[in-house]
Amino acid sequence: MTEYLTHDVILNLGDEAPEDLTLNMLRFASRQTTLVIARSPVENNKTLEEALDDQQKILRKKSQAMTLTPAQVTRLGRNEHHVDGREMAIQMMVGDKPYYQLQAACLVPGQQRMLVLNYSKPGPLSDDDISHWRAIKGELRFA
């Protein structure tokens, strides 16, 4: 039997184990920022870099007015429990408004699943926003 834990409930899904494609969206109203946590399966023969390349191709098709910085190696989590991931900055137009995003992605330890954190704001990120993002990345822990 597969059980699935969400923030509010545990669902009994019987014998069928679905792919976890869930999104969590957290809004920080006073900052006007949003943190989106997304999960997706990664094919067994693909690396994190290849999975990110696939994701970027999809994003580019959806938004022509988008700029991405090259992905850089980043550390997610605390000291001995950290994982290496990739981080990039993204700027895109949503309608007539610019959105600024910082994105970090990693493979979930022991699984062939990608976890993506996307921190965004409708306008430039302030130094305080960037510090907040770094704290979120630095304190990440896997369940």
Task: Label each PLM-derived region with a short phrase.
Residues 27-29, 106-111:
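Short glycine/proline-enriched loop/turn "hinge" motifs that connect secondary-structure elements
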Residues 31-36, 84-85, 112-118:
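Glycine-rich, often proline-containing surface loops adjacent to acidic residues and nearby aromatics
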Residues 45, 97, 126-127:
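Loop/helix-junction capping segments adjacent to catalytic residues or to phosphate/diphosphate-binding pockets
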Residues 56-107:
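Signature of long, low-cysteine stretches enriched in small and polar/charged residues
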Residues 2-53:
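Secretory pathway targeting signatures of secreted, lumenal, and periplasmic proteins
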Residues 8-18, 115-143:
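Surface-exposed amphipathic alpha-helical segments
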Residues 95, 110, 122-124:
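Short coil/turn motifs at secondary-structure junctions
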Residues 54, 58-62, 136-139, 143:
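Conserved short hydrophobic interaction patches
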